[in-house]
């Protein structure tokens, strides 16, 4: 009886863990689309994606969004697939698309040349109404 209760608790904990981790990247394999990897510099990852046919999704071309902080640096380097960056932890979200499939890339870094990939997921940008 005690063993079955422990198994039940273990299965429950595994389920909770999977539920919270499930939205990250397709089980966050070591290599993502186009062979990108966690910790890879954004510039290198983007080059791989574009070479494999992923197209940057322009995020703020017509909505009057005002870039600030590291967002300005990304925009200056023509990374218009940038959705947003946080102010407190320098995490940024960028979007790409290929043959109807969306790709979200999350990065971290306060300087353009030091920005690295932290995760990816098959997620489309939210549409504004």
Please tell me what each predicted stretch does.
Residues 110-129:
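A short, surface-exposed interaction/processing loop segment used at functional sites
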Residues 16, 88, 95, 105, ...:
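General secretory precursor processing signal
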Residues 101-111:
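Broad, structure-driven detector of short, well-ordered beta-strand segments within folded domains
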Residues 53-100:
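A cross-family detector of function-defining hotspots
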Residues 22-72:
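N-terminal secretory signal peptides
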Residues 17-21:
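Boundary at the C-terminal end of the N-terminal hydrophobic targeting segment
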Residues 1-6:
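Bacterial N-terminal signal peptides that target proteins for export
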Residues 7-15:
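Bacterial N-terminal signal peptides
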């Amino acid at each position: 009886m005690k063993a079955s209760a422990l198994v039940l608790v273990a299965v429950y904990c595994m389920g909770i863990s999977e539920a919270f981790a499930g939205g990250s990247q397709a089980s966050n394999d070591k290599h993502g689309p186009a062979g990108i990897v966690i910790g890879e510099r954004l510039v290198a990852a983007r080059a791989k994606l574009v070479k494999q046919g992923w197209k940057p999704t322009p995020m703020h071309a017509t909505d009057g969004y005002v870039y600030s902080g590291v967002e300005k640096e990304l925009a200056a380097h023509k990374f218009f697939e940038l959705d947003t960056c946080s102010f407190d932890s320098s995490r940024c979200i960028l979007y790409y698309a290929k043959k109807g499939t969306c790709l979200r890339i999350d990065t971290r870094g306060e300087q353009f040349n030091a920005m690295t990939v932290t995760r990816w997921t098959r997620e489309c940008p939210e549409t504004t109404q």
